[in-house]
């Protein structure tokens, strides 16, 4: 991951869903305090926290002259909220909506020039937010989780049975929450072990500079997955959207047939020969970034 040390950092907090959420706004080092910059709101994936997997993109966007905000969802990273490490996609979308309002309120941000950026699970949230905010300049989603049912069915049956069993137990059992690994080495138990997930996490740790990563997710979180299907709302997107799908993605299978069936003229689709985590790293990262910068400069 590329360093963010050349960007000016502005820390802040906002309240969402009863929790105090941590946010970081990155602006170009040479930006004036009275300058209003075009901005990007970054929405991370399933087990994401600030800087993990996103810092190379964030740095590049700041270098291109944008103000870029990352944030932690309630119960994750530097944000407050209990219980910890839970995921509910509908709640997360509401939190992201509040984060968007927070970004618009920042003095160095041009509120009428905001682009949403989402990766993996966050890509699904961007679809949902884009349908609610026709005033936004645009949206970018990469390796998006558009169909939770397809992602669920792509899980090996024995693994799926264990995930659902633990999720159900966590949902209904009184007492302490049950946690499962968010990421795991290939073949080991966790919510993500395919497509080089473990190796990607180890690389992402370098960007956290000793901050650490709590590699757990509440087991009941997996029960939401098959019911979360943002592709069904893709037809309602009315702002320019760049969608980069990976044809070899086995974590969040790219449902290109469903996207084509929707046929939304506002959505530009680029398919790349890659797995779920390839776009974050060389050799694919520069090409993926180039597509996104071209879209942002349109």
PLM region descriptions:
Residues 237, 243-245:
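Short beta-strand/loop motif that positions the catalytic acidic residue
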Residues 46-59, 73, 255:
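The serine-hydrolase catalytic nucleophile loop
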Residues 250-256:
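Conserved alpha/beta-hydrolase "acid-adjacent" motif
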Residues 50, 76-111, 115, 281-288:
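Catalytic nucleophile-loop/oxyanion-hole region of alpha/beta-hydrolase
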Residues 60-80:
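Conserved alpha/beta-hydrolase
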Residues 1-35:
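N-terminal cap/lid segment of alpha/beta-hydrolase-fold proteins
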Residues 34-45:
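Short beta-strand element of the alpha/beta-hydrolase
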């Amino acid at each position: 991951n590329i360093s963010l040390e050349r960007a000016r950092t502005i820390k802040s907090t906002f309240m969402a869903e009863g929790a105090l959420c941590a946010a970081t706004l990155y602006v170009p080092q040479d930006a004036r305090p009275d300058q209003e910059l075009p901005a990007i709101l970054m929405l991370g994936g399933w087990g994401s926290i600030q800087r993990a997997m996103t810092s190379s993109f964030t740095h590049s966007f700041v270098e291109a002259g944008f103000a870029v905000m990352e944030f932690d969802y309630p119960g994750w990273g530097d944000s407050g909220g209990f219980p910890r490490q839970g995921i509910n996609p509908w709640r997360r979308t509401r939190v992201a909506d509040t984060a968007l309002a927070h970004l618009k309120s920042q003095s160095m941000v041009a509120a009428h020039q905001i682009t949403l950026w989402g990766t993996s699970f966050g890509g699904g949230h961007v679809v949902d937010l884009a349908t609610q905010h026709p005033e936004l300049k645009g949206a970018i989603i990469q390796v998006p989780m558009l169909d939770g049912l397809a992602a669920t069915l792509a899980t090996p049956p024995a693994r799926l049975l264990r995930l659902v069993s633990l999720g159900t137990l966590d949902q209904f059992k009184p007492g302490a929450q049950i946690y499962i690994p968010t990421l795991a080495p290939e073949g080991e138990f966790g919510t993500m072990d395919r497509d080089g997930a473990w190796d990607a996490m180890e690389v992402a740790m370098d960007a956290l500079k000793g901050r650490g990563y709590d590699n757990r997710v509440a087991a009941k979180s997996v029960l939401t997955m098959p019911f979360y299907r943002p592709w069904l709302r893709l037809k309602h997107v009315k702002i320019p959207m760049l969608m980069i799908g990976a044809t070899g993605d086995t974590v969040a299978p790219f449902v290109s047939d469903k996207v084509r069936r929707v046929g939304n003229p506002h959505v530009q689709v680029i398919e790349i020969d890659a797995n779920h985590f390839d776009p974050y790293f060389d050799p694919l990262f520069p090409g993926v970034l180039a597509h996104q910068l071209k879209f942002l400069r349109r």
